[in-house]
Curated annotation (Swiss-Prot):
Its EC number is 2.1.1.228. It comes from Geobacillus kaustophilus (strain HTA426). Keywords: Cytoplasm, Methyltransferase, S-adenosyl-L-methionine, Transferase, tRNA processing. It catalyses: guanosine(37) in tRNA + S-adenosyl-L-methionine = N(1)-methylguanosine(37) in tRNA + S-adenosyl-L-homocysteine + H(+). NCBIfam families: PRK00026.1, trmD. Specifically methylates guanosine-37 in various tRNAs. It is found in: Cytoplasm. This is tRNA (guanine-N(1)-)-methyltransferase.
């Protein structure tokens, strides 16, 4: 996979891309991540990328020309690239979206700044608009980091344990079950006996139940569209009674 990040502040990414999973993924050749300062594509003497909004109003708006030219440059020979605007008006980012993007071969992430984008960028250039949450950030860089991390870890061969991304919270549609490691008894706080039993069938059922319980207690909204089994429906009824 290739990921191009269009930003006015490429230095913000140096630490993120040179550590942990993202560093290893690049070293393995699983992903090619490139930083593009789209100010370099401005066609004016002072390399200005923003201007006052027509009709008046507060703030400055990103001009279409530098972004159009930068995108056309990085997508030359790659007509199927996904062009993604990071903006608060976009679709709420989810694990499902990460899994969708992980199937692509070329992503272009555009990090906004100032008051926003010229609308023609949205209308005629972007294929997607994504928001990472209902809050305002200084720019799209942090959102781009979130997308890159969540997508790259899903690429084949990036994580050591191929089951790891599948077991993560949200991948199954539910929150992840509780995890424990050594020691089995820490200051009187003990690991559940069933996890020490060696009975894989019982452990699998415990994890399924605890995953559902945690989702029920913390994110019940995730259950609205989750395909519950009869057994899981029975568990939910029991927990509902306990709360009455």
């Amino acid at each position: 996979m290739r990921i191009d990040i269009l930003t006015l502040f490429p230095g913000m990414f140096s630490g993120v891309l040179s550590e942990s999973i993202l560093k290893k993924a690049q070293e393995k050749g699983a992903v090619d991540i490139r930083l593009i300062d789209f100010r370099e594509f401005a066609d004016n003497k002072h390399k200005t990328v923003d201007d006052y909004p027509y009709g008046g109003g507060a703030g400055m708006v990103l001009k279409p020309q530098p972004i159009f030219d930068a995108v056309e440059h990085v997508t030359a020979g790659s007509p199927g690239a996904r062009i993604i605007l990071l903006c608060p008006q976009g679709e709420r980012y989810t694990q499902k979206k990460a899994e969708e993007l992980a199937k692509e071969t070329h992503l272009v992430l555009i990090c906004g700044h100032y008051e926003g984008y010229d609308e023609r960028i949205r209308q005629y250039l972007a294929t997607d608009e994504i928001s990472i949450g209902d809050y305002i950030l200084t720019g799209g860089e942090l959102g781009a980091m979130v997308i890159v991390d969540s997508v790259v870890r899903l690429l084949p061969g990036v994580l050591g344990n191929e089951a790891s991304p599948v077991d993560d919270s949200f991948s199954s549609g539910l929150l992840e079950y509780p995890q424990y490691t050594r020691p089995a008894d820490f200051r009187g706080m003990k690991v559940p006996d069933i996890l020490l039993s060696g009975n894989h069938q019982l452990i699998a059922e415990w994890r399924e139940k605890e995953s559902l319980r945690r989702t029920f207690l913390r994110r019940p909204d995730l259950l609205d569209e989750y395909p519950l089994t009869d057994k899981q429906k029975q568990w939910l009824k029991e927990w509902e009674k306990e709360r009455e």
